[in-house]
Amino acid sequence: MHAIARFSIPLGQASEFRAQLATLQSVLAQAPGFIDGVFGQNLDDPTLWHLSTNWENVGSYRRALSSTRAKLEAIPILARAIDEPGAYE
């Protein structure tokens, strides 16, 4: 299962947001079922960012987001994501 979150972030917030994405990836990486993940800034439009993660199954992804640590550290960052479907087979 692949989860993709895209973000539109003003250029002035880019370095801070990169650090936030690193924290987010670190939080998710500790969850059972996490396989791997990457994040990056779009080359053509530097205000666009993505976080892509791979999971054993959709249940492990959903459980990761419902953990206390995720609610405190990850969800506030994910709340900034562009509102669009992000779960893929």
Task: List each model region and its residues.
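Short, well-ordered beta-strand segments in beta-rich or mixed alpha/beta enzyme
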Residues: 2-8, 38-65
